[in-house]
Amino acid sequence: MTERPFWQQKTLSEMSDDEWESLCDGCGQCCLHKLIDEDTEEIYFTNVACNQLNIKSCQCRNYEKRFEYEPDCIKLTRENLLTFNWLPATCAYRLIHEREDLPQWHPLVCGTKTAMHRERISVRHIAVRETEVVDWQDHILNKPEWAR
């Protein structure tokens, strides 16, 4: 019998830093800008990608120095995970926290990001560069399937 993968054996708080980092599927959904209504605090999702996001690969161009380039970049940690209630339903951190398993397309399960892109989980098919946007309101999406 094969040993169960670490995400089926451990809680998020029990994971090593490397295990924690490996949970990220690299979909880029965190890297799309969100707009917040100042009156209602409702979050509006956009298809506008952070300048540091390589849209084709859905990876940060400067991951190690991302906070220097983008001070508003989020840092998802074990301590602040619950404050990011907008995380997509497909997010591994959210799934593991909710005691769900990773989907079959997740790179830790299938070994590649190809399935994630094919299933259109990543943002590569909808994202636009921040520098190309004139009116941000034109880029507000209806609440996507991946957002609850």
UniProtKB/Swiss-Prot annotation:
Pfam families per record: CxxCxxCC
InterPro entries: Puta_zinc/iron-chelating_dom, UCP006173
Similarity remark: Belongs to the UPF0260 family.
Protein name: UPF0260 protein PC1_1943
Originating species: Pectobacterium carotovorum subsp. carotovorum (strain PC1)
